């Protein structure tokens, strides 16, 4: 997500997403801040709050990646784009999507609906999902530095908590 352009392998094995909430933390390295700016609030909430992993083609349709290429051509396509031999621009989401992300009333409405759904599914027992919701909703209107600072604090708090420790131990087996 920190790249200008992202090229992914169009292969059945490729999965793209931010699964950290399934381990009781939230996406780090700017993920909870960058994804909303890249694909908008509704799609990023779906990806981050569920921790779902998407096939490359689905990720491309959602705007998570800018180009997909068959595995045998992936390196060549990426090099051509990096060297300027092939033009590739990020998809523009359009003014409606931009307006929705920048509208505080819409963000508040989306947040309240998402919070209701989260509470219904988790009964508030998974704090990472609620923290991720707050991070994603705030992302379009705050600076990268502010978002990174808040994200680091949230990850540190969540990673040292009992829910994260329990989920990681389940993951490890």
How would you describe each model-predicted region?
Residues 1-4, 34, 42-154, 172:
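Amphipathic alpha-helical segments at domain termini/boundaries
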Residues 1-23, 27:
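Glycine-rich beta-to-alpha active-site loop
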Residues 38:
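Conserved catalytic core of Hanks-type protein kinase domains
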Residues 162-173:
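NAD(P)-dependent dehydrogenase/reductase Rossmann-like domain
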């Amino acid at each position: 997500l920190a790249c200008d352009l992202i090229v992914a392998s169009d292969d059945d094995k490729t999965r793209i997403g931010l699964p950290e909430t399934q381990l009781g933390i939230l996406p780090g390295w700017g993920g909870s801040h960058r994804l909303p700016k890249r694909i908008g609030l509704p799609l990023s909430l779906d990806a981050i709050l569920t921790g779902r992993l998407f096939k490359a083609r689905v990720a491309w349709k959602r705007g998570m990646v800018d180009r997909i290429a068959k595995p045998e051509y992936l390196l060549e396509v990426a090099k051509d784009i990096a060297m300027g031999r092939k033009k590739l621009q990020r998809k523009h989401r359009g003014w409606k999507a931009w307006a929705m992300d920048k509208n505080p009333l819409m963000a508040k409405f989306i947040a309240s609906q998402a919070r209701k759904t989260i509470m219904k599914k988790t009964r508030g027992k998974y704090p990472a999902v609620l923290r991720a919701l707050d991070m994603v909703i705030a992302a379009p209107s705050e600076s990268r530095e502010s978002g990174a600072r808040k994200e680091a604090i949230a990850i540190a708090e969540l990673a040292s908590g009992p829910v994260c420790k329990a989920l990681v131990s389940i993951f490890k087996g």
